[in-house]
UniProtKB/Swiss-Prot annotation:
The lineage of its organism: Eukaryota, Metazoa, Ecdysozoa, Nematoda, Chromadorea. InterPro entries: NASP-like, Tetratricopeptide_SHNi-TPR_dom, TPR-like_helical_dom_sf, TPR_rpt. Residues 10-25, 103-112, 369-382 have a biased composition (Basic and acidic residues). GO terms for biological process: CENP-A containing chromatin assembly; defense response to Gram-positive bacterium; DNA replication-dependent chromatin assembly; innate immune response. It comes from Caenorhabditis elegans. The gene is nasp-1. Gene3D superfamilies: Tetratricopeptide repeat domain (1.25.40.10). Belongs to the NASP family. It holds the Pfam family SHNi-TPR. Residues 264-304 form a coiled coil. May interact with zinc finger protein tra-4 and histone deacetylase hda-1. One of its GO terms (molecular function) is histone deacetylase binding. GO terms for cellular component: nucleoplasm. This is Protein NASP homolog 1. Changing L53S: In tu439; strong resistance to B.thuringiensis-mediated killing. Resistant to infection by S.aureus. Reduced life span. RNAi-mediated knockdown of pmk-1 (by injection) abolishes resistance to B.thuringiensis. Residues 1-39, 103-151, 337-382 are annotated as: Disordered.
Length: 382
């Protein structure tokens, strides 16, 4: 979108806000926020939401980012490029909230089941009361599932809106033949949204869609980011998770292995930087901390690979067992006593092909009888 047009619209809002005031019934007036004030409040809400996400305070993050999303739409209009950040982080918070609700739904359900069992053993509970309790618990569980579905759906809608904004911006930049840096920046934003949509698909059980979104994100990242980027490693892990969730363990092993390769490349890169010497103490500390973090992370990745290899082997063993069982069943059937006609029919698949029915030999037609009589008369005359 045109930046100059945005600035012009902002100037109009500032004039309207400073020149007009709403009169209340008591005779007092209240001044509206200027665009600058709203933008400052928006930045504060975004910062607060991101801080809450970092410390895993999802409820607080969701509240701040929900308000930020609403405010950004009020300032710039819906689907404006400047609303992207609010939508992206709000979608992230809502997705985490949906995951939490899904976990909570499983936990209390198990607890209630145990409580009901204890209640069923107590003498002071009648069968009627137990039946009512089970009905109420079932209704509550259904309501919780609906809430979980609503949150999951909301997170998808928010992230999909952000994806559309990024895609439209990239298309506009390419049409304008803008600088490559701006196009790459928005491509990476698109990749970030696609990664979250991939996570959403995994959480929602839509593994094929998750794989497609993550694969698109990976292609963008590999074109823009260095091969040692940890963002690429993260996407590899998520694709591996999508494959594992869909029981494609051979592919899971491959993607987890690629994750390890990227992390090793990053380790090598950091070691070279430190060996060459880093004058900036803060930068050196960052490199050392990241290197330590990667070293601590590596055993977990190797364990994931080992688990995937084990799962792939189990699937292969199961396939072999099913095949052997089927072959054994076929052999048992072959050894069963059969009539001679049945044996011939079983070995002759030609009976499966439909043919026109033949007339019975012992039932000649009238024409055949007449013809036969004439032949006999001819023979007699000879």
């Amino acid at each position: 979108m045109d930046t100059e047009n945005i600035a012009d619209a902002s100037d109009i809002r500032v004039k309207d806000a400073s020149g007009d005031s709403d009169e209340k019934g008591n005779g007092t007036t209240t001044e509206e926020e200027t665009v600058e004030q709203k933008e400052k409040r928006l930045a504060e809400l975004l910062a607060a939401g991101r801080r809450a996400l970092k410390v895993n305070d999802i409820d607080k993050a969701s509240d701040s980012l929900s308000e930020a999303t609403e405010l950004s739409s009020e300032i710039y209009g819906e689907n404006h490029e400047n609303t992207f950040d609010s939508l992206y982080y709000y979608g992230m918070a809502t997705l985490e909230l949906a995951k939490e609700e899904s976990q909570l739904l499983k936990g209390p359900g198990e607890k209630e089941s145990g409580d009901e069992e204890q209640a069923g053993n107590s003498d002071d509970k009648t069968d009627e009361e137990n039946g009512e309790t089970e009905k109420e618990d079932g209704e509550e569980s259904g309501e919780e599932e609906d809430d979980d579905d609503d949150t999951m759906k909301l997170s998808w809608e928010i992230l999909e809106t952000a994806r559309c904004i990024a895609a439209a911006k990239i298309e506009a930049l390419e049409a304008e033949q803008s600088g490559i840096s701006a196009i790459e920046e928005w491509n990476l934003k698109l990749a970030d949204v696609l990664v979250l949509l991939g996570e959403h698909g995994i959480s929602d059980g839509k593994y094929t869609q998750a794989f497609e979104d993550l694969d698109r994100a990976l292609n963008i990242q590999r074109n823009v980011l260095p091969p040692s980027s940890r963002k690429i490693a993260q996407t590899y892990i998520l694709i591996g998770n999508a494959c594992a969730s869909d029981a494609n363990y051979d592919e899971t092993v491959q993607y987890f292995g690629k994750t390890k390769d990227v992390l090793i490349a990053r380790q090598t890169e950091l070691k070279h930087e430190l060996e060459r010497g880093v004058d900036d103490k803060e930068k050196k500390s960052e490199f050392e901390n990241e290197l330590k973090e990667l070293e601590e992370m590596m055993p977990g990745v190797e364990e994931m690979i080992a688990d995937a290899v084990h799962s792939a082997a189990q699937v292969e063993e199961t396939k072999k067992a099913i095949k052997a069982q089927f072959e054994g069943f076929t052999q048992v059937l072959a050894k069963l006593p059969q009539e001679a006609g049945d044996q011939k029919e079983a070995n002759d698949i030609s009976s499966l092909v439909r043919r026109p029915a033949k007339r019975a030999v012992d039932a000649p037609t009238d024409n055949q009888a007449v013809k036969k009589e004439k032949e006999e008369e001819g023979t007699t005359s000879i």
